[in-house]
Amino acid sequence: MRVFNFSAGPAAMPEEVLRQAADEMLDWHGSGMSVMEMSHRGKEFMSIHEAALTDLRDLLGVPASHRILFLQGGGIAENAIVPMNLLGSRKTADFVVTGSWSQKSFTEAKKYGTPHLAATGKTEDGYTRAPVRAEWQLSDDPAYVHLCTNETIDGVETFEIPDLGDVPLVADVSSHILSRPMDVAKYGVLFGGAQKNIGMAGVTLVIVREDLLDRALSICPSAFEWKTIAANNSLYNTPPTYAIYIAGLVFQWLKRQGGLEAIEARNIEKAKLLYDTIDSSSFYLNKVEPAARSRMNVPFFLADETRNEDFLAGAKARGLLQLKGHKSVGGMRASIYNAVPLEGVKALVEYMKDFEQRGA
């Protein structure tokens, strides 16, 4: 029996995608091979690779000025790869820290330059807000400005993206990419791990403006140098072929759903249902300011935290899995990515109401 999976990542996958992958596991399109057996330079995989790139460019509206790269190492590796590729002759990059992941990015950048904290969303209750542009104190000549547009752990999402002129904006979009339309032209670099809305763990997405490809530090490994990866169409070394294949199936699924406008409408409906349930209750609490609440990751706390384990056990009995909050913040977290259906959120809300009534 399939359950409703609220994991933050690796996360729920569209069932259609899983079934198609299962059907094609032993014999992809009459080739007699599984995708995971194919040469990454053979015509079979090349057709998969090119289709994935084309479909993603179409879904996001990626302009011709930007290259799409498939790498490895996840978002955490990009915390090192970004400064190694963008600092160039400069030493400073600015960071807007809105949660745990942008804090990790800021800390990692200290190994390669002198990062500057331009703004923070931290309050006495933790990370609960997204600083607006007027609050950003940028340095005089930063190589780039870094922002995590959705903080998976803290449940903070930044919706208003400013125009920074000649300063490249770098965004970690790991946990909200493909959940809503984006103006890619506003960004110098977008990056994210795949294991939330793109597909399975193993491939990392980077979208980089071409004019930024000549800034790499000499210490940057060739396998992580964006210019080298772009020149080789993401095939400089053996790529994570099966993860790219799965990502391609997800892109096709998204197009069948009506694209990102249709997906965004669904996600707004799911998030509203869950937040309304939390806000109308004295038993559940979300600490994030309403304007910065994530549509993808909804942390919440029980008024009586001694009942956390009872809540999780009861949820599991109803087929509602992986609701435990991140160890750094505690409580609960429901990750309601694209593949989590409205029915799953309705089932969670019904359980939350039942659990509250039993404890009243």
Curated annotation (Swiss-Prot):
Its main location: cytoplasm. GO terms for cellular component: cytoplasm. InterPro entries: Aminotrans_V_dom (IPR000192), Aminotrans_V_PyrdxlP_BS (IPR020578), Pser_aminoTfrase (IPR022278), PyrdxlP-dep_Trfase (IPR015424), PyrdxlP-dep_Trfase_major (IPR015421), PyrdxlP-dep_Trfase_small (IPR015422). Keywords: Amino-acid biosynthesis, Aminotransferase, Cytoplasm, Pyridoxal phosphate, Pyridoxine biosynthesis, Serine biosynthesis, Transferase. It is an enzyme of class 2 (transferase). It is found in: Cytoplasm. Its cofactor is pyridoxal 5'-phosphate. CDD domains: PSAT_like. Pyridoxal 5'-phosphate binds at residues 101, 152, 172, 195, 237-238. It comes from the Bacteria. Binds 1 pyridoxal phosphate per subunit. One of its GO terms (biological process) is pyridoxine biosynthetic process. The modification N6-(pyridoxal phosphate)lysine is found at residue 196. SUPFAM superfamilies: PLP-dependent transferases. GO terms for molecular function: O-phospho-L-serine:2-oxoglutarate aminotransferase activity; pyridoxal phosphate binding. Catalyzes the reversible conversion of 3-phosphohydroxypyruvate to phosphoserine and of 3-hydroxy-2-oxo-4-phosphonooxybutanoate to phosphohydroxythreonine. Belongs to the class-V pyridoxal-phosphate-dependent aminotransferase family. SerC subfamily. PANTHER family: PHOSPHOSERINE AMINOTRANSFERASE (PTHR43247:SF1). Homodimer. This is Phosphoserine aminotransferase. The gene is serC.
